[in-house]
Each structure stands twice: as C-alpha cells, then as structure tokens.
Amino acid sequence: MKNIRNFCIIAHIDHGKSTLADRLLEFTNTIQVTNGQMLDDMDLEKERGITIKSHAIQMEYNYKGEKYILNLIDTPGHVDFSYEVSRSIAACEGALLIVDASQGVQAQTISNLYMAIEHDLEIIPIINKCDMASAMPEEVEDEIVELLGCKRDEIIRASGKTGMGVEEILAAVIERIPHPEGDEEAPLQALIFDSVFNSFRGIIAYFKIENGVIRKGDKVKFFNTGKEYDADEVGVLKMELVPRNELRTGDVGYIISGIKTSKEVKVGDTITHVARPCDKAIAGFEEVKPMVFAGVYPIEAEDFEDLRASLEKLQLNDASLTFQPESSLALGFGFRCGFLGLLHMEIVQERLDREFDMNVITTVPNVSYNIYDKQGNMKEVHNPGGMPDPTLIDHIEEPYIKASIITTTDYIGPIMTLCLGKRGELLKQEYISGNRVEIYYNMPLGEIVIDFYDRLKSISKGYASFDYHPNGFRPSKLVKLDIMLNGEPVDALSTLIHFDNAYDMGRRMCEKLKELIPRQQFEIAIQAAIGAKIIARETIKAVRKDVTAKCYGGDVSRKRKLLEKQKKGKKRMKQIGNVEVPQKAFLAVLKLD
C-alpha cells in the first residue's frame, strides 16, 4: 500500500492533458509509442479532440530501486463534464494541475482546482507545451504562484509533444503525493467512480478500495441499492482488463458480476461484503442535476422502443443523462431528456447516431421552471407544453447561475454587452494578472442554454473562458411563445421566454422558418403568438400554375372563371393540407443568433 499512488489530471480544454498522459504511459512502458490519445477511445473524442469520459489506467514504475504502482485517472476539461471530474477527484489523493504555457490559467482550470482543494488533494502544478514558440512560462508561473501560493521551484515545466519533464513529473508524483490511507483489516469499503457497459459481460464497475480487501468469488453488496452479487471477476485496469485474485486497500480496479441494468450501479455508491458489511457508505459526491432539457424524438414512430433501449445503454456510462417518456402532437412519442449543457446534448445526439444508428429530432432546449399558482402550490415544469393556463399562474421562477468569465482586457466591452443582453447583472470583476480579468455575473440559465457559449467564443476570438455554478431560483416575467402554421400551434417549437425578448425572438423565428419550410400548393401563414395575441407573421406564398395560359385573347370572364376555380381548389387544399416542418428547420431555430 505504501507504494501505490492515485492521481488525476486537471486542466482546461485543450491544455494537452491527454497527450501528456500518453507520454507518461509510454515512459512507464505501459503502451508502445503510438499516434496519440490512448485514453480517448470514443471516435467522437478523437474527432473533437476533447475528453468526455474519465478513464483509469494503471502504470508500474521503478524509482530509486523500488517498484511503484501509479493509477492515473484522466478527466475531461469541458464545463459540461465537471461531474466526471468530481468523481475522479473523489478516487484520488493527488492531482496534476496542467496549464498551457501560451494560454495561462483559464476559468475551467480554476473551478476544477477548487474541487480538488476541497477534497484535500496534493496539487502538482505543471506548465505544458513549453516547446511552443508562443510559450510564456515566466508569466504563467506568476499566475500559478498567485493562484496556489506555491513556491516557484515546485512548478514543473513539461511538454506532451517532446516528452520533456516527464521524468520529473513521475518523480514528483511519487515524492509529493501521499499514499492511500486505509485499514486492510476493516470491513470492505470501495467507492464506485465509473461504470461501463460491455455487451458480453454486462456492466463493469470501476472502484477504488478505501478499506478492506476484495477477492474473486466474494459475495458483495452495493450499499445504496442493497442488491447482492457474486464477484465473478476482479482485477486492475491496464490498457485492457487484467484479472487478479484479490485487490487490497488503495487499489483501483474493476468488478464484473453479471449486472444487466444500469439502475443497479449508481456511481458514487459503496461496495461492501455481505458477510461483514461496513457501517456507513463513503461520503461520495452529490447526484448530478441536469441543467438543460430537450425533447428527443425518433424520426420513424416505430423506432420508439429502440430509442428507449439506446438511451438506457447510453445512460450506463453517462450517469448524468436522465430521460422520461413524453408525447408531442407534432412529433409523436419521444423522451424528455435532461443534459448537463449544450455540448453534452450535442454529444448524446451524435452518440445515438453513431453507436446505435438512431436518427432523432431534438426540440428547442429549455431549463426547468418553478411555477406557483394562485393557491401557492408549486409545480416544476421541464417542458413548455406542461405550462398551466396563464390565468391560473401567480408567478414563475427560473433558475439562475453564477458565471465566471476570464478574458483579456481588450474584450471586456463586447463581453459585458453580451451579458447585459442576456439579462446578466455584474457582481464584480478582478484582475488576475497584467491584462487578464475575471468577471462574475448573475445570469438566468435559460439565456445561456441556446447560444451563449458560441457567441462568447466568437466575440473574444476564442480568448474568453467560461464556467458556471447554479445559484438558486428567482421570480421572472416569462411568457410562453407559440409558433403557429396556418393557425395550428407546432408544440415542438414552443418556448418559455422573457417578455422583453419575446417580440424579437418571435420575429426571428418566423423569418427563419419562412426560409426553411418548402413552398406548398397553398399559402402558409407562420405566426408567433403569446396566448391569443399574434406578435409576428410571415407568409409563404403558394406555388401556382398559370391556369390562364391556354386562353388566347377572348373574354375576360373566361379567365376569371378559371382563376375562381383555382382559388376554390387552393382553399380546399388549405383546409385538408398539412405542413411538414423539416428537421433542419428545427435545428436552425435552435441556432438563431
């Protein structure tokens, strides 16, 4: 146990943590030299160059004549996936804080760092990408010293590309990170920090043993669900699973016990023995709360059950995805899914498409609102369709967040304009170093859901970074905006929106739909309405045949007769014709800027 070190890697997006992890794995001979990103094994992760899932891997390293076991847990850096980080942090004693030498400290670095400090982890600061021409290691060192209060000589300079500094990092991990504390004689206590689904073996749970020993064939039970299992196989995580006969305190490993449903494995649960259970569960981490909700519908109605199965499988290794069935007049049966943020929503959609071959339509994302009626009862609504009649509502409360934005001084003006446009209120601003500022805002989550992050990146030319935390509910003047086609509301396009923005949004949605809905044989009226009041309208003109073309000269009444006849036909068509809204129109309305 003295020779085990458990550590994770914390960094902002794109500061090079997965590449540096590859170098550590190569240096310890865990893998052969490869073309990169061993731990990002989803195609999607490779393509987008981001880490979505946490990954655990064990390395062996000889240092000063002793053999050490190092368990590395790679974590994502994107704001949507901070729950993945909190789980990984709970399973470690130390963390490598990686900062890009050319970009410096960013919002996500800070928020993940605070999480690590709360769990009392030993922090090893590393400046990565020091081989780049644009690197400014001196200035970045100043920022880190100010942030952590560490000494300058504790900061390691490294490069994931050239492999510089890798030996120093491994030495620091062994010297500075404490070994796991725990009692091998005590009853078994192991924290589950991840689970993956394997179609042959069922669910594989990854855990870290806090106290006690687990052996192959033991009868174990999961503390929170109370279910009992046989440990068919336990082992450690190398590049593949390596079975072992027993795992001791401080080890990180996996257990296979033929579990088939995802509900039974709760990440953050405690594994213990049936014969000698522990008294209490390990204080894990809070349940993940989805922030953004959207309807997900199959394009073909008969794929509904397949979609349910696919979502259940996704939920196995994405604990934060929630879903419940709902139905819509325009789209039929589907699910109301809860996501952590917009990136998460996009990724779930892509994974449905790639891994399960499901084509889905997603509706406008929204957040959950608390609605109070005149009697003072509260109802939580995730879906604009679930809104009670406006006459019964006393007031509506919407969720707020506390956002922290880090940027250079050049972009403060445009960013403040953006935040004010999104109904943000400035809390404070602090200068981190020379020309870097951290700005804090209180903002409604509903304003951020749709396009805030993209716009922040584009007005700051990619230099601003953004992070947020929930900050309670507040009363707000919200109205339900309906979009109607020929007087029929399309429920998938309804949104709850602040009264001040409703007119503008209604007008833009109508204009966008006018471009995207194909012309029919009859004219289509696109209207935006609040209750019974129409606030915007666009008309798609009918496609019509020139019925008078066959008349040569002759009497005007002959032409009029043909035109009247055409008009009657169009009128009849309009009564029975229905308008299909194409999928790309749904997506375009989401991305209105």
UniProtKB/Swiss-Prot annotation:
GO terms for cellular component: plasma membrane. It catalyses: GTP + H2O = GDP + phosphate + H(+). The keyword RNA-binding does not apply. It is an enzyme of class 3 (hydrolase). Residues 2-181 form the tr-type G domain. GO terms for biological process: positive regulation of translation. GO terms for molecular function: GTP binding; GTPase activity; ribosome binding; translation elongation factor activity. It comes from the Bacteria. The keyword Ion transport does not apply. This is Elongation factor 4.
